[in-house]
């Protein structure tokens, strides 16, 4: 469908951080797909760099931004390999206050490189740490990969980000409420690192 309503909890979280900050907030949305998080951040006044390797998905995200009334927001739409983009941003010295990651379980890079989330996530988070501003607010990591639990994601964020930058990490399954039964339909996992400025 291109819409992930279970992510609303994360959208609310980052919107609260953006609106509560006493400064402009730069957001990097990686593997950004159809742009739900991008739209949420734009609605709160952030500057957003939206990156996805699929031209079609980026176009869909632009349409979603227009339908949501934020097409004129401070956004750059980038069609690129997310790993290569982050590596270039490190070299350029560009820094972000919030990074949102929604990486696929499996994929291929532009030169046939194979991506397995379980094998590559730790190294990728290490790259992401290098594009965080000194007073970064958050890193939000989502996964729909069955072999990657919330506790493993929490460990990775703690080992890479808390060790280097302080702050704290929380992680949990995310899901959708089921009206008929009162239960919750599991829909993946999320882990959130909050920097010192993101904990206020």
Indicate residue ranges for each PLM-predicted region.
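S-adenosyl-L-methionine
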Residues: 54-100
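Short beta->alpha hinge that forms the Motif I/post-I loop of the SAM-binding pocket
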Residues: 32, 52-56, 120
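A short glycine-rich, Lys/Arg-flanked "PGG" loop and its adjoining helix->strand segment in the class I
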Residues: 120-134
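SAM-dependent Rossmann-like transferase core, predominantly class I methyltransferases
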Residues: 1-22
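C-terminal catalytic and target-recognition region of SAM-dependent MTase-like enzymes
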Residues: 136-200
